Amino acid sequence: TFSGLSKSHMIAGFRIGWMILSGAKERAKGYIEGIKMLSSMRLCSNVPAQAIVQTALGGYQSVAEYVKPGGRVYEQRECIYNALKDIPGISVVKPHAAFYIFPKLDVEKFNITDDEQFALDFLHEKQVLLVPGKGFNWGAPDHFRVVYLPNVLQLEKAIGKLKDFLAAYKQK
């Protein structure tokens, strides 16, 4: 069994996870030894984050208040979705089970042939980082990803900068 706290407890980025092996461990002895060797050579434990595991697993387990209307994550998602759908040249689907949104750009309107260049142009001009779709194995240069965990004011500011940027953007 594999599990983690990143999504269930809204601490994305901390990469706190675990693996539980049950049953006849003798059959998995080589696998277990390989995991032990790999973890002792290549992995560095996130000691500060490990301190929250016991509290997280032993405490209140619901995120319902965050994802219902009025909740922080709900309001952040609504903010980013509504702001993006109102920008000419962007189409977007509202996410239902993620902390990010994956908008589509009208590549003809903006003359986009390289989504990485688009992200770099936006970063250089407006100092806001977007992740190009190719970073998630998206084949066409027409998507980018935005995590909507920052507070609503930060999201509004960033999307305002994107709207201003796209008003005059044509990729060279």
Predicted regions located by residue number:
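Conserved glycine-rich beta-strand-loop-beta hairpin in the small C-terminal domain of fold type I
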Residues: 54, 70-84, 92-106, 140
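PLP-dependent enzyme catalytic core of the Aspartate aminotransferase-like
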Residues: 111-113, 121-130, 136-172
